[in-house]
Amino acid sequence: GIPCGESCVYIPCTVTALAGCKCKSKVCYN
Protein backbone atom coordinates (compact mmCIF):
# COMPACT_ATOMS: atom_id res chain seq x y z
CA GLY A 1 0.00 0.00 0.00
CA ILE A 2 0.84 3.67 0.08
CA PRO A 3 2.16 5.15 3.34
CA CYS A 4 -0.30 7.76 4.61
CA GLY A 5 2.26 9.67 6.63
CA GLU A 6 0.87 8.71 10.02
CA SER A 7 2.33 6.24 12.48
CA CYS A 8 0.29 3.91 14.69
CA VAL A 9 2.81 2.75 17.25
CA TYR A 10 1.05 4.03 20.36
CA ILE A 11 -2.28 5.19 18.99
CA PRO A 12 -4.34 3.94 16.02
CA CYS A 13 -4.61 5.81 12.74
CA THR A 14 -6.87 8.81 13.27
CA VAL A 15 -7.08 11.41 10.51
CA THR A 16 -5.74 9.09 7.83
CA ALA A 17 -8.16 6.37 8.91
CA LEU A 18 -10.95 8.56 7.58
CA ALA A 19 -9.24 8.35 4.20
CA GLY A 20 -9.29 4.55 4.35
CA CYS A 21 -5.82 3.99 5.78
CA LYS A 22 -5.14 1.00 8.01
CA CYS A 23 -2.35 0.19 10.44
CA LYS A 24 0.42 -2.08 9.16
CA SER A 25 3.92 -2.45 10.62
CA LYS A 26 3.43 0.57 12.89
CA VAL A 27 2.58 2.82 9.93
CA CYS A 28 -0.77 3.78 8.41
CA TYR A 29 -1.10 2.50 4.83
CA ASN A 30 -3.78 3.11 2.24
UniProtKB/Swiss-Prot annotation:
UniProt modification remark: This is a cyclic peptide.
Tissue distribution of the protein: Expressed in leaves, petals and petioles but not in roots and runners (at protein level).
Disulfide bonding pattern of the chain: C4-C21, C8-C23, C13-C28
Superkingdom assignment: Eukaryota
Cross-link (Cyclopeptide (Gly-Asn)): G1-N30
GO biological process: defense response
Keywords of the record: Disulfide bond, Knottin, Plant defense
Comment field on protein domains: The presence of a 'disulfide through disulfide knot' structurally defines this protein as a knottin.
Function: Probably participates in a plant defense mechanism.
Family: Belongs to the cyclotide family. Bracelet subfamily.
Protein name: Cycloviolacin-O18
Protein species of origin: Viola odorata
